[in-house]
Amino acid sequence: MELLQVTILFLLPSICSSNSTGVLEAANNSLVVTTTKPSITTPNTESLQKNVVTPTTGTTPKGTITNELLKMSLMSTATFLTSKDEGLKATTTDVRKNDSIISNVTVTSVTLPNAVSTLQSSKPKTETQSSIKTTEIPGSVLQPDASPSKTGTLTSIPVTIPENTSQSQVIGTEGGKNASTSATSRSYSSIILPVVIALIVITLSVFVLVGLYRMCWKADPGTPENGNDQPQSDKESVKLLTVKTISHESGEHSAQGKTKN
């Protein structure tokens, strides 16, 4: 680009001296329109005009440039510059659009998959095979719009969750209940069995002690040798009865003797 600009600057004084003013004005206008960004420092035209050699005779020297060559070169350079400037403009606009798209995308990042996570973490409940009820939870999902600003729009989508479960899961819950009841019964049995064993041991020990006491009481020397098992108190009571009967008979005999007399 710099080389083209330098060549154009060297060609400007010769163009001013030529008769093709209309072409120069058109080329200058196109150059002014297209060159927007690059800043060009143009030297003084007077010093350039002094250095340029203008022919006076009909023969063109080697260092001079004709009008046709100037026209062709200026048109080619003008078209080249316009194409370059248009390419630069296109790239700059594309870059700005990309920046805007990225900023919009970062702004519209919404944390909305909470509904999805709750749906995945939620467990179904009980079921009857005849009817299954469903509840609707409005979840919002991010969907990009086709507009050039690329801003995201939120649309609500109803999501259904089954409240009831299959019969196999119900059977599984019943099996869990049975397992819990069996565990509790095992704990009770582990407590009851030692108590029952202790009671049996106590009753056996009581029977053994009673048997030993009776054996010792039979071997007591106060009992008679003829093998009577009655205790002394019983014998005393028998003696008292015999004494009473004897006294009663003697009283009757005395009463009969008195009546006879």
UniProtKB/Swiss-Prot annotation:
Residues 19-190 are extracellular. It comes from the Eukaryota. Keywords: Cell membrane, Glycoprotein, Membrane, Phosphoprotein, Secreted, Signal, Transmembrane, Transmembrane helix. The modification Phosphoserine is found at S237. Residues 212-261 are cytoplasmic. Highly O-glycosylated. Sialic acid-rich glycoprotein. Glycans are attached at N19, N28, N98, N104, N164, N178. Residues 118-134, 146-171 have a biased composition (Polar residues). The chain crosses the membrane at residues 191-211. Residues 1-18 form the signal peptide. Pfam families: Endomucin. One of its GO terms (biological process) is hematopoietic stem cell homeostasis. Endothelial sialomucin, also called endomucin or mucin-like sialoglycoprotein, which interferes with the assembly of focal adhesion complexes and inhibits interaction between cells and the extracellular matrix. This is Endomucin. It comes from Homo sapiens. The gene is EMCN.
